[in-house]
Each structure stands twice: as structure tokens, then as C-alpha cells.
Amino acid sequence: MSEKVPTTTSTPTTRILAIGTINPDVDQAKVFEILPNEVRETVDLYLDGKIDQWYSLQDRRGVVFILNVTDPTVAHEMLEKLPLGQAHLMSFELIPLGPLKQLRRLPGMTPKPQ
């Protein structure tokens, strides 16, 4: 007897991965001038529970945030309010994250009613 593999069901977005990099041809002196305020405001977002985790990029200047936000538009607006965003010195790539939906294909998993 073969088990039915559930069809693909949607999974919710539970976090946003935000990869921030300094824009090309930016004067680094401007970045360093703004950086202390950027760090303080980023810490505030962390303490407010908006940023879950943060890391630095190893291959170039930039940061990675795992945001406790589910809407990319909200994430974009939040990050653009940071000092480097307001100065148009940093840009973010936003990637919605969710549960590993492939786990639904494990034997014995049954689709949940929607």
C-alpha cells in the first residue's frame, strides 16, 4: 500500500532575511560618520524584538539580519528608516523565510485542512 504524498501547500512567512550592503561608489567617510547612530538604532530594533539575529558578511562589508517581521514591505520600511538607509548609503535584499515545506513530504505526514 503506497502512501499519498501531500500536494504542495503554502507555508507562512515567519521571518525575513535581510542582507544589507553598502551601495557602490559610496564615500566611506560618510558611512563611518553615520555608523555610530546606525549601530544605536539597530540595537534599539534588536531590543524591541524586531531583529532576532544579526551577523556581519564575511566576503564584503555588510550585515545580515533575521527579522521578526513577516511582511517584506514592513521590513523594507523599517530598514529604510535607519540612518544609512535615510542617507541612501545602504541597500537591503529581503528574502521571506518560512518553515521547511519539504518536510510535508515525509512518509506519514498528512495535509492540514486549510
Language-model-derived ranges and their functions:
Residues 1-114:
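Conserved, structured core segments of small domains
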